[in-house]
Amino acid sequence: MPGSSRQSGREAGSALLSLQQEDQENVNPEKAAPDQRARAALKTGNARGNAPQQRLKARRVAPLKDLSINDEHVASGPSWKAASKQPAFTIHVDEEEDTQKIPPEHKEMRCEDALAFNAAVSLPGARKPLVPLDYPMDGSFESPHAMDMSIVLEEEKPVSVNEVPDYHEDIHTYLREMEIKCKPKVGYMKKQPDITNSMRAILVDWLVEVGEEYKLQNETLHLAVNYIDRFLSSMSVLRGKLQLVGTAAMLLASKFEEIYPPEVAEFVYITDDTYSKKQVLRMEHLVLKVLAFDLAAPTVNQFLNQYFLHQQPANCKVESLAMFLGELSLIDADPYLKYLPSLIAGAAFHLALYTVTGQSWPESLVQKTGYTLESLKPCLMDLHQTYLRAAQHTQQSIREKYKHSKYHGVSLLNPPETLNV
């Protein structure tokens, strides 16, 4: 009979279930047989339906922190949780069946409630933008790093050591004293048996090209010419060694003035290997001995940098033209060896100022230097003649140098026909 068969089946099932429960109470879940654990877990799973299996399938890529199991949960949870060693069931039961856990939304609510009691740690509200999002940003709002870079690009001209008001007078007095000590002999070329002024002019013109090739400072060129003249004032040199003297002088000047002077091998190279490295170093040693290691010689360039501070207002073209005229005076030993560098610088500054702006030697420099326009006149007349003949001079390296935009093309300016003296 169907009814009796169903009833007997239910009784047999309940008996079997009670036996399984007794086995679970008497057997350690960790040592239970695999088939018993599987049957218990499967039976419980069937009793709960298919929803847990679907949730398990979605949790298989859970973070590692979700795989940890608490001992308390194992002891207090259903028996089949501890019995099963399948990761999927463990993940599912640990998340879903533990009624003691606080849902994430409850945790957030409790944290917010706790923070709400303390105003000092309360979370701020949503911030609003200070300006509309579509408002165009002003170009002045730049990052500090970008502003620093722009400042560096604008300040291309290095700060002069002469621009120290507290020491202007002391610096000028010291330079005026040293220029007398470091002045070459006026007529030394007459005592040279094998070289002439024209050979010296060719050497200086070549040194101008060397300075441009290696991007050396103008001061380096002025120092090198001073070393050459002082050396030739004391030593007789054959024409075959004159370039060696100039190379050693340029090497010394670059070591004294430049941050990164060219290597000795570079100076050997620019002589087209006419001299060896050993010869250059030996000549450098000899020049140092003859000069008594006095390398800090005042130059026309140094005095010009002092005179430029007295421009009202400052004019870059005047400065470039004065530097051009100062370098022209390096080419010809006669007549410029008889003038002090401070006097040549004064004549160059006045001639440049007059050519560009029509102004004259300022009164502030009369008080500072003691040079009046009348005292500058002899040197000024010689420099004016040199300026007029510069385009026809045999040596053209200085004119080519000052044609560049870096120096505002001042060598292309027409010199004045007359002077206001």
UniProtKB/Swiss-Prot annotation:
The modification N-acetylmethionine is found at M1. PROSITE patterns: CYCLINS. Gene3D superfamilies: Cyclin-like (1.10.472.10). CDD domains: CYCLIN_CCNA2_rpt1, CYCLIN_CCNA2_rpt2. Keywords: Acetylation, Cell cycle, Cell division, Cyclin, Cytoplasm, Mitosis, Nucleus, Phosphoprotein, Ubl conjugation. InterPro entries: Cyclin, Cyclin-A_N, Cyclin-like_dom, Cyclin-like_sf, Cyclin_A/B-like, Cyclin_C-dom, Cyclin_N, Cyclins_cyclin-box. GO terms for cellular component: cyclin A2-CDK1 complex; cyclin A2-CDK2 complex; cyclin-dependent protein kinase holoenzyme complex; cytoplasm; cytosol; female pronucleus; male pronucleus; nucleoplasm. One of its GO terms (molecular function) is protein domain specific binding. Interacts with the CDK1 and CDK2 protein kinases to form serine/threonine kinase holoenzyme complexes. Interacts with CDK1 (hyperphosphorylated form in G1 and underphosphorylated forms in S and G2). Interacts with CDK2; the interaction increases from G1 to G2. Interacts (associated with CDK2 but not with CDK1) with SCAPER; regulates the activity of CCNA2/CDK2 by transiently maintaining CCNA2 in the cytoplasm. Forms a ternary complex with CDK2 and CDKN1B; CDKN1B inhibits the kinase activity of CDK2 through conformational rearrangements. Interacts with INCA1. Cyclin which controls both the G1/S and the G2/M transition phases of the cell cycle. Functions through the formation of specific serine/threonine kinase holoenzyme complexes with the cyclin-dependent protein kinases CDK1 and CDK2. The cyclin subunit confers the substrate specificity of these complexes and differentially interacts with and activates CDK1 and CDK2 throughout the cell cycle. Belongs to the cyclin family. Cyclin AB subfamily. This is Cyclin-A2.
